[in-house]
Amino acid sequence: MAALLVPGGGAAPGLVWRRRRAAVQCAAASPSSPDPSWRTNVVSDRVSVEPSPRTIHECEADVVSGNPPAAPAAPAKAKAPPGTPVVKPLRLTSRPRRNRKSAALRDAFQETTLTPANFILPLFIHEGEEDSPIGAMPGCSRLGWRHGLIDEVYKARDVGVNSVVLFPKIPDALKSSTGDEAYNPDGLVPRAIRTLKDKFPDLVIYTDVALDPYSSDGHDGIVREDGVIMNDETVHQLCKQAVAQAEAGADVVSPSDMMDGRVGAIRTALDEAGYYHVSIMAYTAKYASAFYEPFREELDSNPRFGDKKTYQMNPENYREALLEVHADESEGADILMVKPAMPYLHVIRLLRDTSALPISAYQVSGEYSMIKAAASQGMLDEKKAILESLLCIKRAGADVILTYAALQAARWLCGEK
């Protein structure tokens, strides 16, 4: 079967991973020592059995005459180990284990399926030409926006991951108290977006809308002299940032700042600029979490003073998420997010049960790094732990997952070791 080609992007994303997955499943299903009479011809992705020289009428006549062809004997009943007590079977009307007794049955009744299409790959970018590994996040690098970024997206698409979100490391000299660099049309993020769209027209690009990477104060908003984060003035800046990203070609803008009213204001700004087609992924329930540290260290976006508790949600609160859901829905959000993911699975389920909108969840840097650290010490099986962590986020109700393990997990799902 010929590859489906996309202009500038090579084989269509997802096609390669599906082929690899099918090849692995086909190999697993093939008999290791086939009976000589079981002859197969493999042509492309089809398996055919050569017909027997005997007619159907001859075969039926044998059966009718009481001379059926030989077949394997029924398997012998397995014996219990010595010392097993002899008991009467429990009189159970239901035995749920019956539906778990084989891999085929478990697969047939599996309620949650994880695929590379469920992943959004976060990518760190900077102005340099070289890629720089991130010590606190093994397997992740700060990518040069010209070359390293392109190479990483090629790798992602090769295993079916066709969605990325960009996070910039901004030079200190470009940071200011009002974060004006955030909406520079020739800034790092707009340039990266245009470069990616030139190479991969069908790539889905998410962007981060917030001032902290651009702020000399390290906060998500403009800081008043008494330390108060100014809400409405910040929203004004965020609208300009979102429009600049949309103009560059962003598909989805993602306000992560947690300012009140920012979703509605951004929706209005995008529409007035003619970007009706650009979606908004709202960071609906973003908690003031301890799990963000590796990310903030990488982007140098830690607040220079205080913390972010006056705008991010209190980890002790649950019902408050409902207020944010209703606000974001009414203001025009297209996707709702929970961040972090694993410590807040119940909040993901709350959003899933409350809203008909798609739900995203962010497996943040601390979650990712914990698994990596434990695996490096031999405390966890890395593959099993990562895939289980992502599966439980999906099971809780997330439609898409932002995860630094997207590439690794997609390769495993493709059958690669």
UniProtKB/Swiss-Prot annotation:
SUPFAM superfamilies: Aldolase (SSF51569)
GO terms of biological process kind: chlorophyll biosynthetic process; protoporphyrinogen IX biosynthetic process
Active site: K286, K339
Principal place of residence: plastid
Cofactor: Mg(2+)
Family stated for the protein in its record: Belongs to the ALAD family.
Protein name: Delta-aminolevulinic acid dehydratase, chloroplastic
Provenance organism: Selaginella martensii
Origin organism lineage: Eukaryota, Viridiplantae, Streptophyta, Embryophyta, Tracheophyta
